Amino acid sequence: IIIKNMARTLFKNANQAYQYQLNRILIDGEDFDDTKTLFNVGFTLAYPMENHITDEDRNWSLGYAKAEWEWYLSGDPSIDKLGEIYGKIPPIWEKMADSNREVRSNYGWQWQRNNQIDYVVAKLRNNNKTRQAAISIYDAKEHSTYAKDTPCTYAIQFTIMHNKLDMAVMMRSNDIWYGFCNDQYQF
């Protein structure tokens, strides 16, 4: 069995991971559909709270990332809620919204359904060695609601290792320019 690109690299912070992975995609990325891609990429951030992308070519917006995070925390899939928080609705969300102006791939809406966060907390409190503390975001029963946007994140698993909370995020797809920069901030 050959597993391509399964190198698990340790980075100091999100910006270092961004710069490294962007370079890897540009050099080693395979043509796939209308983009370049790397499959089966995994990495660890030593300091996950250092989650600002400072690469000047990217011009990442902390203000927008904070607004998107607040939108997710609200659990409201309405793009109007994001507009209320951020002051405007970014065109990408207008494009991805359904006829009710909702985005069902909204992570907050997904993880709040079925009280998944409470479930994870209870599992970890009951057994700090559990492997069942996981949140499911992508749900095959909801294919029809993903008509314009399928969640990039499949699931998030929480474990306690060395008395610290670890989080592993499994992604279906994550573009380096927009998806990675904002998703890593949320997680």
Predicted regions and their residues:
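Terminal, non-catalytic protein-protein interaction segments that mediate quaternary/complex assembly
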Residues: I1-F187
